[in-house]
Amino acid sequence: MNCIIKTESEIKKMKVSGKIAAEVLEMIENYIKPNISTEEINNICHNFIIKKKAVSACLGYHGFPKSICISVNDVVCHGIPNKNQILKSGDIVNIDVTIIKKNYHADTSKMFLVGQTNILSQRLCKIAQESLYKSLNILKPGIPLYKIGEVIQNYVENNNFSVVKEYCGHGIGRAFHEEPYVLHYKNKSHVILEKGMIFTIEPMINAGSHEVKCMKDGWTVKTKDHSLSAQYEHTVLITENGCDILTWQKNEKIPSKFINK
């Protein structure tokens, strides 16, 4: 596997891209309420990205028709914003943003709870986010890549949820998708983490079975059993002693139990 080690100049540019991607999610939070359409959310994000003098990486990517992915309830990933899809109280929503600034990509996503949600929805989103945080906690040079999937799967299954296996994290830089490919379940990858690697970790967690199906539009992926699904994603840089989260949000805080002392 040919993993690209980023130069200091490239890392500097990707930090700028990561900051913008994070700002999109920070900005859109106040708009996630009942009675807004997913297309309106898309348009608000698109305009914000343009104001930042960046470009949506999703728009036109292999024919994808919108600027961001919005996945609601049993949609696992790649949901297409639609003027007829109106959010309602009780929905859980993933917004996935990938931007390009000065030729360098950054990719991030998070869950939003709409109005009054039930305990299952809240717990699913919590465990999905915590599984990402647990994986971030182990990152440093010399760690085998497969450890990421091992940590995520163990945590998720110990909490009685399942990990989607068809989609994975990925290297990122000048290209949207680069090596290495980051599996979120137990695997036998021989890749060893090195300083200067940049990739995404983006576990997709289902309340029921891990099985998924792709819809006729060729993009939208749903759980086969119609159970809820949740995902969180960050773009991370491997540093000399750990990692730097390039898409960190200002209001984000990792619980102390997930931080090495």
UniProtKB/Swiss-Prot annotation:
Q: PROSITE patterns given for it?
A: MAP_1
Q: Which InterPro entries match?
A: Creatinase/aminopeptidase-like, Pept_M24, Pept_M24_MAP, Pept_M24A_MAP1
Cofactor note, please? Binds 2 divalent metal cations per subunit. Has a high-affinity and a low affinity metal-binding site. The true nature of the physiological cofactor is under debate. The enzyme is active with cobalt, zinc, manganese or divalent iron ions. Most likely, methionine aminopeptidases function as mononuclear Fe(2+)-metalloproteases under physiological conditions, and the catalytically relevant metal-binding site has been assigned to the histidine-containing high-affinity site.
Where a divalent metal cation 1 binds, per the record, is at D96, D107, E233
Please list the coiled coil stretches: none
Question: Which terms does the record give in the GO molecular function aspect?
Answer: initiator methionyl aminopeptidase activity; metal ion binding; metalloaminopeptidase activity
Q: Does the keyword RNA-binding apply?
A: no
Q: Which GO terms describe its cellular component?
A: cytosol
Look up the signal peptide feature and give its range: none
Function recorded in the entry? Removes the N-terminal methionine from nascent proteins. The N-terminal methionine is often cleaved when the second residue in the primary sequence is small and uncharged (Met-Ala-, Cys, Gly, Pro, Ser, Thr, or Val). Requires deformylation of the N(alpha)-formylated initiator methionine before it can be hydrolyzed.
* Sequence similarity: Belongs to the peptidase M24A family. Methionine aminopeptidase type 1 subfamily.
Cross-referenced HAMAP family:
MetAP_1
Q: Which PANTHER family match?
A: METHIONINE AMINOPEPTIDASE
Protein name as it appears in the record: Methionine aminopeptidase
Lineage start: Bacteria, Pseudomonadati, Pseudomonadota, Gammaproteobacteria, Enterobacterales
